[in-house]
Amino acid sequence: MTKITVVGAGSWGTALAMVLADNGHDVRIWGNRSELMDEINTKHENSRYLPGITLPSTIVAYSSLEEALVDVNVVLLVVPTKAYREVLQDMKKYVAGPTTWIHASKGIEPGTSKRISEVIEEEIPEDLIKDVVVLSGPSHAEEVGLRQATTVTSAAKRMEAAEEVQDLFMNSYFRVYTNPDIVGVELGGALKNIIALAAGITDGLGLGDNAKAALMTRGLTEIARLGRKMGGNPLTFAGLTGMGDLIVTCTSVHSRNWRAGNLLGKGHSLEEVLESMGMVVEGVRTTKAAHELAEKMEVEMPITAALYDVLFNGNNVKDAVGSLMGRVRKHEVEAIPDLL
């Protein structure tokens, strides 16, 4: 039995805490809403973020980060990307020794465009880091909460660390593969949110299956293009954290990013969409970060650029579709010649 603290009591953090508790681990979960932590402890439910799911009674919730981290050497971070530095700066005051830092957040840090593992390594002193591991893949919290079959990937620079995390999570309904490509796994999980927003827009506009299939396929090309430039393995983007996560996020009503895009496609403003969602839509911030990265690294990402103009420059969604369809003719695979 391993002592694990889950930092972040949203839908995904709560679902992963359930998986770990089902596996017999000593699981604590921290959140900044004391009434929500009280509900988890007394009613064994997170009615705000994962309603209708009865949580194992062994999960103990804390609103004090200091108390949640006592005698723990494995932490699972599941907080919005914009909150990472602030949370990590608090956490390092209370972590006593070398710790395995797992993160399951799919995004890029706003402002710096850095991957979350890079943020962890910048904020946490070396003597407090045993390993940094990423957990990512096609995984809606709602389905994991129902213990429906789910498969994800554990990635770390040190394969033994990825395998240790694999062992922590594996059970009859939650399968975990390993991958040494931490860059590709993080980028696949983050960048697919951009394409999911765009897929939601195509559905909101009623453009049909042909358009959506093309968008997802060309979107995956963009993800792989930037991922390769940043050091990711092209094969990673054909796996669970690339194609797999892209499919589930672009086609499911559980997807916040798809739902947000769908509302945009139906004519709602970004402000209206974000207000109505009530939860973080990482794809909005990730679009900005990826657009900045693409310009800096001179990587062609036309779908990302078109979505950026819709979100941040007020471009009309129909005009964005027209601009993509009217681009100069191209060879389909010219951008990824080493895959031929």
UniProtKB/Swiss-Prot annotation:
SUPFAM superfamilies tied to this protein: 6-phosphogluconate dehydrogenase C-terminal domain-like, NAD(P)-binding Rossmann-fold domains
Main location: cytoplasm
Record-listed sn-glycerol 3-phosphate binding positions: 106, 137, 139, 192, 245, 255-257
Keywords on record: Cytoplasm, Lipid biosynthesis, Lipid metabolism, NAD, NADP, Nucleotide-binding, Oxidoreductase, Phospholipid biosynthesis, Phospholipid metabolism
UniProt-listed Enzyme Commission number(s): 1.1.1.94
Residues at the catalytic site: 192 (proton acceptor)
Family (UniProt): Belongs to the NAD-dependent glycerol-3-phosphate dehydrogenase family.
Protein name: Glycerol-3-phosphate dehydrogenase [NAD(P)+]
Organism: Bacillus cereus (strain AH187)
Taxonomic path: Bacteria, Bacillati, Bacillota, Bacilli, Bacillales
